[in-house]
Amino acid sequence: MPQVDPELFDRGQFQAELALKASPIAAFKKAIRLAGEVLDKRFRAGSEIRPLIEARAWLVDNILQQAWNQFDWGDQSGIALVAVGGYGRGELHPHSDIDLLILLGAAEHEQYRDAIERFLTLLWDIGLEVGQSVRTVDECAEQARADLTVITNLMESRTICGPEALRQRMLEVTSTAHMWPSKEFFLAKRAELKARHHKYNDTEYNLEPNVKGSPGGLRDIQTVLWVARRQYGTLNLHALAGEGFLLESENELLASSQDFLWKVRYALHMLAGRAEDRLLFDHQRSLATLLGYGDDNPKRAIEQFMQQYYRVVMSISQLCDLIVQHFEEVILADEESGSTQPLNARFRLHDGYIEAANPNVFKRTPFAMLEIFVLMAQRPEIKGVRADTVRLLREHRHLIDDTFRTDIRNTSLFIELFKCEIGIHRNLRRMNRYGILGRYLPEFGLIVGQMQHDLFHIYTVDAHTLNLIKHLRKLQYTPVSEKFPLASKLMGRLPKPELIYLAGLYHDIGKGRQGDHSEIGAVDAQKFCERHQLPAWDSRLIVWLVQNHLVMSTTAQRKDLSDPQVINDFALHVGDETRLDYLYVLTVADINATNPSLWNSWRASLLRQLYTETKRALRRGLENPLDREEQIRQTQSSALDILVREGTDPDDVEQLWSQLGDDYFLKHNAADVAWHTDAILQQPADGGPLVLIKETTQREFEGGTQIFIYAPDQHDFFAVTVAAMSQLNLNIHDARIITSSSQFTLDTYIVLDNDGGSIGDNPQRVKQIRDGLTEALRNPEDYPTIIQRRVPRQLKHFDFPPQVTILNDAQRPVTILEITAPDRPGLLARLGRIFLEFDLSLQNAKIATLGERVEDVFFITDADNQPLSDPQLCSRLQEAIVQQLQAGQGSDTSPTRVTF
């Protein structure tokens, strides 16, 4: 800490001001305010962070000493003001708590009571954010013995005012000779660290991480220092290196990483104007600017800043893991342990952990840097890597160069890892953590810590990739196999499962580079296959999967799967059943590894439908596709059989069906047609809207809830329907709109509840939905179609210009309207009003919410049931949609991207 810094605080000048003022409060406040401005100015000017946080602690020392001296303490030998915790370490950020201990020598301290109360009142009056306790030395010992947090705080202490002897007495009675021996303290701190990491999902890669508490955060560094202090009396990272727990290079890396997090935390406090350790979306853009991450694209600047953050915390996490493992081996060492078992000439087992047979293993035989991970995958009983060997890996990874990457021993070992029955994900994760994977595959190194600034991708690209591989592996185990039965079945019968793991490793590797990441990744995958001398068939499949890994999810979510042409086109693109099997499994794993909340029962049902229909088309033969007329005949014939068996008059059926167009029979299966027909024929002429509700499938974890509405076609019908569903907390995922020749609407909606599941067997909920919709549709003109709801905090930070695309389908008489926009309440109802205003008919809709954005596709026609053909009408429609969406956002955006 600085000895004297008159620009920050001049003692003589301050005391002179105190003498001139009747009340000291104004002088203290002025001194604190001016010093804060000086420190903030230094920060913005690029001052090093360590002197800044030490200078703030020095400033507070001086303020506290001046405040302490305002009171008559009498005999000061029995009282001391002690800094503890972070302030005790001499580290203070702009709004950090100032933790104080007023330490008393004896239980009888009545003579100090009045001065203590007045002193603490003054601190609050002058605006210091103080956390204080008043304890005797004996009380410190009693509470420290019972509370891990108390003993930790007392270990980091400094005397600010009063006799140092009191603090030394306190340190003596709380030493390892009396409580918390180093082994017990280490076990408690290790458990505390694990619990804290679990609170943050055991990942450094949260979208809104906590700079202090998340894995790899400042608290991890503090934890290893606390343990070292309890064991060795070591006070800082440099001293820790002196004890042999860190190499000098590791000490420098850990110190620079700590400085980076200190800068981020300091800036966070400045921007928030309060103690804030969470990297909320609210602050990420301002932080990126303040810390100097410049880019024409603000989103890209945020991603650059966050990538550095993630890489820093990953480094901290790796080094702290290494130190903690060293502590385990030293502090928890059992005199009778130490049994070793040779594995081969290069490695042995030591108490269940693998270690290098000698320090020169990786230098003499560099291929051992890959072999160690293959051995762990082949021997699942191996618990992990001993700390010294982890360090050897880190020290020798520079040997992984182009020569290493093309050595057949290394390429063979890497492929061998993917052929292991278990341990693929675990050991790829270790390779990534130790920095080996990014060295062996430089293209993978580019995506380490790379985030995408949105709510859809909740993991960095490298974490998502490894999660995908983990999900592929878990498909073979219950209960995961029960939730994904088809994917699990297909995974178990893939002829070469290692190929889907390799495709998964490369599927997003092209992200962060200019261009289509699927195409870039396919080029990288081709080079990988050539370097690893994979057979031609294997290479073609891997490259094709990387290039097309988004095709199946895009088709299922954005195309009309009831259209035979859509199925035939997709089947032509896939080509054969083997590719279809691989692609389906990869798609399921990709979606679930992107964002767990993205997967729902309806998306599962769509993918199964696309898989099943495509497989049927492939088996029928691509040269012999099913046409629309044949599909309509099959549906009508099967539905009529069901109705006749139930006693329905075929003439009544024929009369009703004659009023319906072909699209109705294309968009519904035979069972649903029979269900609808029976209910409509039994509906009284003046019975009001008919609302039917049922589940679309009996398979657990698949399907959605189907709501069928039959009613006279009325003004604002679609807008009222979707608004009512929104009020009922239903999420619409699919809509099929049919208008009969008798001007009745037959609308089918697929909905899910807010939890992402179908309504299921819940009579009360079904009745609530039926009653709510019936009431709204009975008098639609009286129902408010614009739903006013508060926009969630996170969504507010992801405004972007809406994108509206209008194009005509070359194979069907409809116009396709594609909308990508920020997710906002009431969006569908707003669009319904626009369709009404432009006299448009909605034929079908595919609704997808992806994080903070919606990607909706509407199939529309004009009043004559024809595709839109007037360019001026299309232009006005686009303009109206953009205006409505921007009104829903409540903020200005730049003009939309428009495509005809």
UniProtKB/Swiss-Prot annotation:
One annotated GO biological process: regulation of nitrogen utilization
InterPro entries reported in the protein's UniProt record: ACT-like_dom_sf, ACT_dom, HD/PDEase_dom, HD_domain, NT_sf, PII_UdlTrfase/GS_AdlTrfase, Polymerase_NTP_transf_dom, UTase/UR
SUPFAM superfamilies recorded: ACT-like, HD-domain/PDEase-like, Nucleotidyltransferase, Nucleotidyltransferase substrate binding subunit/domain
Regulation affecting activity: Uridylyltransferase (UTase) activity is inhibited by glutamine, while glutamine activates uridylyl-removing (UR) activity.
All residue ranges annotated as the HD domain in the record: 461-583
Record-linked SMART domains: HDc
A molecular function (GO) term: [protein-PII] uridylyltransferase activity
Domain of life: Bacteria
Keywords, sorted A to Z: Hydrolase, Magnesium, Multifunctional enzyme, Nucleotidyltransferase, Repeat, Transferase
Needed co-factor(s): Mg(2+)
Region of interest called Uridylyltransferase, as start-end residue ranges on this chain: 1-342
Coiled-coil regions listed: none
Location of the ACT domain: 706-784, 816-900
The family this protein is said to belong to: Belongs to the GlnD family.
HAMAP family, per database record: PII_uridylyl_transf
Stored PANTHER family: BIFUNCTIONAL URIDYLYLTRANSFERASE/URIDYLYL-REMOVING ENZYME, BIFUNCTIONAL URIDYLYLTRANSFERASE_URIDYLYL-REMOVING ENZYME
UniProt remark on domains: Has four distinct domains: an N-terminal nucleotidyltransferase (NT) domain responsible for UTase activity, a central HD domain that encodes UR activity, and two C-terminal ACT domains that seem to have a role in glutamine sensing.
Protein's job: Modifies, by uridylylation and deuridylylation, the PII regulatory proteins (GlnB and homologs), in response to the nitrogen status of the cell that GlnD senses through the glutamine level. Under low glutamine levels, catalyzes the conversion of the PII proteins and UTP to PII-UMP and PPi, while under higher glutamine levels, GlnD hydrolyzes PII-UMP to PII and UMP (deuridylylation). Thus, controls uridylylation state and activity of the PII proteins, and plays an important role in the regulation of nitrogen assimilation and metabolism.
Protein's name according to its UniProt entry: Bifunctional uridylyltransferase/uridylyl-removing enzyme
Organism: Pseudomonas putida (strain GB-1)
